Amino acid sequence: MTERTYLAIDLKSFYASVECMERSLDPMTTNLVVADASRTEKTICLAVSPSLKAYGIPGRARLFEVVQKVKEANLKRQRNAPGYRFTGASSSSVELANNPGLAIDYLIAPPRMAHYMEHSTRIYSVYLKHVAPDDIHVYSIDEVLIDATSYLKRENITAKDLAMRIILDVLRTTGITATAGIGPNLYLAKIAMDIYAKHVQPDENGVRIAELDEMKYRQLMWTHRPLTDFWRVGKGYEKKLESIGLYTMGDIARCSLGAPTDQDWRVKWNLQDVCYIHVRKPGGLASGNHKVQVIFWEVASYIPPFLDEMRMKQEDDPEDPSNTREMIIV
């Protein structure tokens, strides 16, 4: 079987970056949040710019959390201000770094989904300059998965070179930067992008590129917590795993559970071999408006063989939390 190489590319704080570029502001140094301020402060922020996240604000915060975090940061900042007083405010992280007398400020941009879709279409056209449409799987408005195997061989380049080439083209075309993950399967490429890339030092353009293979995944990801950081692992899934003493991917990998032919656990835990996701591409993507089928193997298929063999042997009803599970360590 041919060894394959996949790229996962995620546009950094996409909605916030689009709004910054529309205002001729640097997406990496401008404090901006995308939210409908006309609603209550409980409204969810669709995006938070990287410089604003630096104050401990999560990407999907509610607006009141942004207000609270910035207020707390300003209280600390005021202690170092000349005369303990602010002389102004700024939403630029560069200005704030150079002038301790300025209070932290931020911009609130109302969401414009149709506008973001237009930008996504434009960026997709950039991808098509480097990769054929059959090798691009559109995962979301700001994220794609790419089979890079044939391009690396044909052009005699590394996966990192190809990822950087694509990302820099997007940056030149739109002013928006991105993060990339590289792996021998889609799962590892996405985990490299979602988790490992956050620990990689960004370059001068804010680009982060991370690579994971099976051995590196064992070394770096088996002890990572929380489990909800992993692709397709939600709170409910995490809670069920913790109820039987599994807190990390390493814990899961060390358990061989149930008979090899037993599919009951996979179905109940939503770990079917294949998941077909039907999406409609917006105008301008590939050959126009048509329905396409994007296939994503779920965690049970993506995960390396040593973890993919995980099973659960249950003597009684698996839905009953009082039942005992037989854990077989391998």
Where is each model-derived feature located?
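Gly/Gly-Pro- and Ser/Thr-rich, intrinsically disordered tail segments characteristic of DNA damage-repair
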Residues: 1-283, 288, 292-318, 327-329
